[in-house]
Amino acid sequence: MKRYLLSTFTIAAAALLVTSCNDEMDNGLKTGDEGTVTFTAQLPSEMGTRAFADGLTAKHLQYAVYEAGQSTPLPVFGDETRVVGEAEMVDLKKSVTLQLTSGKSYDVIFWADATTDSPYTFDPATQKVSVDYSKVNNNSDNCDAFFKKETITVSGNQSVDVKLTRPFAQVNIGTDDFDAAKASGLEVTQTEVVAKAFATLNLATGEVSDEADRTFTMKAIPTASDGEFPVAGGYKYLSMDYLLVGADKATVDVAFNYGGPQNRTFTNVPVQRNYRTNIYGSLLTNT
C-alpha cells in the first residue's frame, strides 16, 4: 500500500528588526532625490536544521532592479554595465543597500540558490531563471532555491523586509520495508526519479514554461545527515527531489527507479508550490 501526503513547508517568518546607521538618516527627501533603501532578504526563519530543505545551501543571492512594470534592468550598482547585484546569505538572510530615486516605483527581483553546482541560470534581461536538467541529481539539496519580487515606491531612506519562498514542490519517497527487502537480497543504495517539471521560471510573474518529463539522475539514497523522512513511523528515506511547478496545485506521475526487478510508478501524485508531497508505504516488497 502506498500513500500520498501533501503538507506545507514551514514558511512563516518572524518580522525582522533592522537596525543600522540608516535609522538616523533624514527621510524628508524631495521627489527626484536619491533615497537609501535597505532590503533584507530572508528565507523562512524556522529553517536552519541541517537537513533537506533547511535553506542553508541557498547562499548565493542575486537581485536586479526595474522600473515598476518594466522588464529592462537598471544599472544601479555603481557601474553602467552592471545590472545584477550579488551577495552571500548568512544565517538565512542578507541585507543589501541601493540608492533609488525618491517618488519612483520599482520592481526588485531576488533569487537565492546554491553557491556551487547550482543547475540554475538567472537572466536579468528576461527576468527568468532556467534549469539545466543535465546538472540535476536525485537526492541533492543543491537544487533548493528561493525567489521573490518586491514592488516599492521610494519615499526617502527606508528599510524593506523581503520574504523569499520556494517555487518548487518537494517530493519525498520513503518505505518501511527497507530491512525486509535487504534480507531478501534487494539492497537499495541509489535511486532515480522521472517526473514532469518545468524548465523556466519568470521571477517577475511567477509563471513557468517548458514542461517535459525530467530525469533526476540516479544518486545515493539520503543519509542520516539529510534528516529523517518527514512522516513518522520508521520510514527509510529513499528519494528527495525539487520539482519546478506552477502556482496552482497539480498532479504528476512519478516513475521511481531503485534498482529492483522493476520500476515503480506512482500516478496522480499531488504537487504544489512551496509544499512537500510524501509518498510512503511498503514500497520495496509490496509490488
Predicted regions and their residues:
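Sec-type signal peptide cleavage vicinity
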Residues: 2-11, 17-287
